[in-house]
Amino acid sequence: MSATRANKDIFTLFDKKGQGAIAKDSLGDYLRAIGYNPTNQLVQDIINADSSLRDASSLTLDQITGLIEVNEKELDATTKAKTEDFVKAFQVFDKESTGKVSVGDLRYMLTGLGEKLTDAEVDELLKGVEVDSNGEIDYKKFIEDVLRQ
């Protein structure tokens, strides 16, 4: 049960107090930082499946590494999303098949559908996104940029 050097370095960034543990509610952010893309529900399910962690307030790197190993199949599946899977979702809002959606529609999708983001999270995500003169974005480019992060 050994974490990679990169995972240890990222863990250190999350362990702001240098106590060898991170807050349990930071697990999802940590998993995303090391390359997985779990939903909040999956993160909660992973924690709840381990009875020894349900009441814990923090997690050590060894505990997290163990959780990753036990849930490797589910976590790996979260990284398999392809651009085309997301494009299909955006096409529902692209009624004229232009490859673009309005910023308003994008904001609606991100704050109102699926795993909802807050307005502040959407604002952060939209920083640096190229918006054309009609107030629209190229959603394929947007998806690729987000998946690359």
Curated annotation (Swiss-Prot):
The keyword Cell cycle applies. GO terms for biological process: mitotic actomyosin contractile ring assembly; protein localization to cell division site involved in mitotic actomyosin contractile ring assembly; regulation of actomyosin contractile ring contraction; regulation of cell wall organization or biogenesis; regulation of cytokinesis; septum digestion after cytokinesis; vesicle targeting; vesicle transport along actin filament. Ca(2+) 2 binds at residues 94, 98, 100, 105. Keywords: Calcium, Cell cycle, Cell division, Isopeptide bond, Metal-binding, Motor protein, Myosin, Repeat, Ubl conjugation. Changing residue 93 to A: In MLC1-1; causes a defect in septum formation. It comes from the Eukaryota. Changing residue 114 to D: In MLC1-11; abolishes interaction with MYO2 and IQG1 and reduces interaction with MYO1. Leads to mislocalization of IQG1 and a severe defect in cytokinesis. One of its GO terms (cellular component) is site of polarized growth. Its main location: other. Ca(2+) 1 binds at residue 15. There is a cross-link at residue 116 (Glycyl lysine isopeptide (Lys-Gly) (interchain with G-Cter in ubiquitin)). Residues 2-37, 81-116, 117-149 form the EF-hand domain. GO terms for molecular function: calcium ion binding; identical protein binding; myosin II heavy chain binding; myosin V binding. Pfam families: EF-hand_7. Ca(2+) 3 binds at residues 123, 127, 132. It is found in: Bud neck; Bud tip. Essential light chain for the class II conventional myosin MYO1. Also acts as light chain for the class V unconventional myosin MYO2 and for IQG1. Involved in the assembly of the contractile actomyosin ring at the bud neck during cytokinesis by recruiting IQG1 to the bud neck. Also required for chitin and MYO2-dependent secretory vesicle deposition to the center of the bud neck for septum formation. May stabilize MYO2 by binding to its IQ domains. PANTHER family: CALMODULIN LIKE 3 (PTHR23048:SF0), MYOSIN LIGHT CHAIN 1, 3 (PTHR23048). Interacts with MYO1, MYO2 and IQG1 by binding to their IQ domains. Interacts with SEC4. This is Myosin light chain 1. It comes from Saccharomyces cerevisiae (strain ATCC 204508 / S288c) (Baker's yeast).
